């Protein structure tokens, strides 16, 4: 009896139940003490109705078994109230619960007379039958555990239950709708490394893959009758579309079982295939055979399989069925691999755009900061140009070589345009630097500067020093040399004087107007008698009062301090007359030639400065 119980339990034990109701706690454990008895639900037409002990029924006529387990503490003579605890009964065994649900939900069977057989009802014949009735009652109360809707299998098996008999024996009768859903959810799971069959009404499991393949062929394919070669594997993509031959169904079942009998024979290659055609294609990769030639005229390309050839031939026919689905893109390709590469390129571009958008606010903030800094510099320059009354602040910043006493500009704008202060005296008279160090300027009239398009603060410090600097005294030698090396004629009307050695006065603060500019310039030249005596002798057109001071009516030299200039810009130099008759020296850097080459400014004296002033105007 123990052997019969063991064989029936191993043959009929179903898979574990999952997804049960949360109110029923089913721990994954079983009782250490085996169930006291095993009762079977009779399903054969020849068997009698009701429950019968397993000793009275032959083993070959049994179809299903229900292993019922009771708690070891429940005595056989317990009262119905004490043994009616549903929770304790359900916790006793998971397998008994699943088999009870399957037995309760199985469709009625056809008896000998064609009528449906009644369900097995326990009778009070013995104590064991009373315990079985309690278990069946508990299974009925737990019938809500798997209330799944009807799936696709219900449509398939519905007509067989109502009218036509199934094409396989009664021992493989398909379950009802709920059982189909339960089998779909539980079948096919590999428990403890076993290969499970996922046929819709089968719960067999095997240790080896070869056993599963043999089971599918013998139990499910060979038992089919007629021309219906349909795959009833749970979750098959064919959705019960039948094959027209048995061998095709056998080959198709290799997809579900994982069988790959076609193995590569080359050494070092362990690939295997379920279809022989795929193995042949693979062997061509070892042999280099390419039997599929391109059928386009003039094309000699060959391929190992027909699918690659078909992709290639689309390039000749200009047929590109694989189109990009991204909005705004009209690219089309002949094969899906090229389309996948194209889609990856799209994703890469999107990532770059996202990075740019992420870094965009930072870049805009940097640009805004730079613009604000430049705007502040521009504003400060304008304020410096209009700060002083005479407007000499900007001139000192732009021309540090002309103004040796000026402060070095902060932004380095004019540092590369003009030479430093110590370079200017080397090219001019030794007293030029001393004279220019005081930088007393004569402002231009507002009308002149406005007519030229420049502000009084910008034009006056640049043009005025060129026409307002005093003449240097003659050296003590009999002849003075020009920068070109040619001697100047001496003046015989006055003896020579010692060189000027008076120290230069300290630099004056920012000018507060031009009052007293005439006396400041006179203090720079204590030997003005030389100039006053030389002027009438050389010029010959002197006026009254020239020998006693500067004539305000004479448009020359310092006369521009109190008299408006007759012309704007550098044209005023052309209208000035030379007090001394000096030979003109040719120079390429001289801005204007003619009578303006006087003794005060020999040729080339301010050529370096004049050459860079127009560039300053254009830059501003």
Curated annotation (Swiss-Prot):
It is found in: Nucleus. Keywords: Activator, Differentiation, DNA-binding, Metal-binding, Nucleus, Repeat, Repressor, Transcription, Transcription regulation, Zinc, Zinc-finger. The keyword Ion transport does not apply. Residues 477-488 have a biased composition (Low complexity). Disulfide bonds: none annotated. A zinc finger (C2H2-type) spans 195-220, 229-256, 262-286, 292-316, 322-346. GO terms for cellular component: nucleus. GO terms for biological process: cell differentiation; negative regulation of transcription by RNA polymerase II; positive regulation of transcription by RNA polymerase II; regulation of transcription by RNA polymerase II. Its main location: nucleus. GO terms for molecular function: DNA-binding transcription activator activity, RNA polymerase II-specific; DNA-binding transcription factor activity, RNA polymerase II-specific; RNA polymerase II cis-regulatory region sequence-specific DNA binding; sequence-specific double-stranded DNA binding; zinc ion binding. Residues 108-132, 414-515 are annotated as: Disordered. A motif (Bipartite nuclear localization signal) lies at residues 340-356. Pfam families: zf-C2H2, zf-C2H2_15. The combined transgenic expression of the OSK transcription factors POU5F1/OCT4, SOX2 and KLF4, reprograms differentiated cells into induced pluripotent stem cells/iSPCs. iPSCs exhibit the morphology and properties of embryonic stem/ES cells. The coexpression of GLIS1 can increase the efficiency of OSK-induced pluripotent stem cells/iPSCs production. Residues 489-510 have a biased composition (Pro residues). Interacts with KLF4. Interacts with POU5F1 and/or POU5F1B. Interacts with SOX2. Acts both as a repressor and an activator of transcription. Binds to the consensus sequence 5'-GACCACCCAC-3'. By controlling the expression of genes involved in cell differentiation inhibits the lineage commitment of multipotent cells. Prevents, for instance, the differentiation of multipotent mesenchymal cells into adipocyte and osteoblast. Belongs to the GLI C2H2-type zinc-finger protein family. This is Zinc finger protein GLIS1. It comes from Homo sapiens (Human).
């Amino acid at each position: 009896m123990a052997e019969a119980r063991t064989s029936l339990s191993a043959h009929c034990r179903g898979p574990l139940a999952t997804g049960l109701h949360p109110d029923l706690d089913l721990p994954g454990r079983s009782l250490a003490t085996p169930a006291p008895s095993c009762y079977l639900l009779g399903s054969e037409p020849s068997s009698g109705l009701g429950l019968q002990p397993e000793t009275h029924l032959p083993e070959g006529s049994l179809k299903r078994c229900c292993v019922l387990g009771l708690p070891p503490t429940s005595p056989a003579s317990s009262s119905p109230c004490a043994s009616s605890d549903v929770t304790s009964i359900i916790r006793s065994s998971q397998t008994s619960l699943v088999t009870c649900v399957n037995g309760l939900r199985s469709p009625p069977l056809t008896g000998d007379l064609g009528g449906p057989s009644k369900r097995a009802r326990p009778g009070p014949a013995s104590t064991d039958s009373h315990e079985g009735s309690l278990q069946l009652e508990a299974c009925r109360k737990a019938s809500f555990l798997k209330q799944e809707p009807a799936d696709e299998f219900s449509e398939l098996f519905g007509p067989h239950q109502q009218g036509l008999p199934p094409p396989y024996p009664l021992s493989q009768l398909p379950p009802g709708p709920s059982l189909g859903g339960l089998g779909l959810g539980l079948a096919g799971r590999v428990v403890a490394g076993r290969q499970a069959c996922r046929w819709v009404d089968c719960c067999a499991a095997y240790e080896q893959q070869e056993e599963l393949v043999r089971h599918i062929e013998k139990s499910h394919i060979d038992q089919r009758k007629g021309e219906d070669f349909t795959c009833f594997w749970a979750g098959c993509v064919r959705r019960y579309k039948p094959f027209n031959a048995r061998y095709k169904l056998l080959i198709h079942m290799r997809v579900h079982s994982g069988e790959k009998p076609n193995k590569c024979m080359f050494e070092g290659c362990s690939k295997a295939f379920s279809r022989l055609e795929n193995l042949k294609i693979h062997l061509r990769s070892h042999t280099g055979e390419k039997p599929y030639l391109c059928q386009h005229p003039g094309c000699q390309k060959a391929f190992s399989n027909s699918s690659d050839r078909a992709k290639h031939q689309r390039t000749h026919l200009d047929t590109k069925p694989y189109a990009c689905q991204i909005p705004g893109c009209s690219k089309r390709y002949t094969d899906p691999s090229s389309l996948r590469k194209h889609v990856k390129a799209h994703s890469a571009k999107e990532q770059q755009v996202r990075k740019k958008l992420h870094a965009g606010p930072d870049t805009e903030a940097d640009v805004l900061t730079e613009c604000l800094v430049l705007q502040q510099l521009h504003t400060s320059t304008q304020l410096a140009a209009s700060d002083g009354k005479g407007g000499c602040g900007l001139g000192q910043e732009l021309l540090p070589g002309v103004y040796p006493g000026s402060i070095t500009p902060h932004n380095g704008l004019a540092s590369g345009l003009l030479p430093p202060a110590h370079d200017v005296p080397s090219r001019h008279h030794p007293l030029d630097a001393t004279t220019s160090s005081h930088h007393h300027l004569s402002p231009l009239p507002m009308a002149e500067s406005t007519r030229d398009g420049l502000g009084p603060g910008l034009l006056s410090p640049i043009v005025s020093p060129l026409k307002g600097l005093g003449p240097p005294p003659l050296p003590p030698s009999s002849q003075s040399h020009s920068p070109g090396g040619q001697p100047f004629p001496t003046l015989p009307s006055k003896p020579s004087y010692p060189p000027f050695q008076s120290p230069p006065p300290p630099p004056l603060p920012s000018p507060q107007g031009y009052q007293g500019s005439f006396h400041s310039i006179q203090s720079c030249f204590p030997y003005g008698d030389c100039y006053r005596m030389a002027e009438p002798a050389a010029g010959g057109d002197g006026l009254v009062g020239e020998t006693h001071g500067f004539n305000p009516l004479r448009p020359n030299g310092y006369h521009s301090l109190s008299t408006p200039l007759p012309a704007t810009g550098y044209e005023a130099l052309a209208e000035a007359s030379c007090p001394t008759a000096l030979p003109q020296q040719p120079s390429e850097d001289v801005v204007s030639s003619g009578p303006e080459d006087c003794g005060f400014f020999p040729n080339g004296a301010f050529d370096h400065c004049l050459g860079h002033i127009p560039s300053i105007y254009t830059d501003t």
